[in-house]
Structure formats: C-alpha cells, structure tokens
A protein has these predicted regions:
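N-terminal pre-domain/capping segments
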Residues: 1-94
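Active-site acidic/histidine proton-transfer and metal-coordination neighborhood
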Residues: 59, 76-127
Length: 127
C-alpha cells in the first residue's frame, strides 16, 4: 500500500487578500500547497459556473479539492421535516462537489440530541 499526504487549508486563509475562490488555487500552489477544502459550512451558496471554475483552476494548479458540507446537518434529528432538509443539504453539497471535481465531501452527521447512540443511529439510518 502506498501512502501519500497532501496539505492545504479548509477555507480561505486569513492572509489571502483576494476575494475570488477561483484565484485561490493559484495562490495555494504558489505557497507549495496541494489541497483545498472548499467550505460550505454555513450553507451551500456557490453556483455551478463558479464551482466549475474553481475546479478548473484547482486542476490547472495541481490542487486536490474536497468540500465541507454545512455544519448544521443532523441525520439523527427526530423531526422528519428537519431530516428532509438535512438530506437536501447533503445532496446540494454533493452536487457542488461534482461540479468542482472534488475528491470527497466532508459531512458531520449530527448530534445525539439526548438520545443514545443506538437511537440516533437508527434515526440516521432511516434518513
């Protein structure tokens, strides 16, 4: 088995003074980094055109992409309407990741909400 490591930030670094996510992969490559996790922690708001452009820029500069799904995802929420919204957030994150050509989507699957791990898992599996 071959093990390799890539290094880069999750989100835009504080010392990146540009506003453009599309130009960020070039900035990372100039610093010797080769990975970037695009942050959708507060919601998925990037459009297809921008997502594809970020992906193209990342590939051009040898940057491996991943995407972080919204932080408020909770597959173990007992409320069916909330679980329906959660499913939508996960699918939206996956769609953007596909547009970007990201290797993976990072998602925190939720909180126990005063339930046992088994109860929370059963709810999540039903989602």
């Amino acid at each position: 088995m071959s093990i390799s490591a890539r290094f880069g930030p999750a989100g835009q670094a504080d010392n990146y003074h540009g506003k453009s996510s599309v130009k960020y992969p070039a900035w990372l490559a100039e610093r010797g980094l080769d990975a970037f996790e695009y942050q959708c922690g507060k919601g998925v708001s990037v459009g297809e055109e921008t997502a594809r452009a970020v992906g193209e820029a990342a590939r051009a500069h040898g940057i491996q992409l991943s995407l972080h799904a919204p932080y408020f995802i909770n597959l173990a929420n007992p409320d069916p309407e909330s679980r329906k919204k959660t499913t939508g957030y996960v699918l939206a994150a996956c769609q953007v990741a596909e547009w970007m050509g990201a290797e993976r989507v990072t998602a925190h699957t939720g909180a126990l909400m005063k339930r046992s791990r088994r109860e929370a898992l059963d709810i999540a599996l039903d989602t």
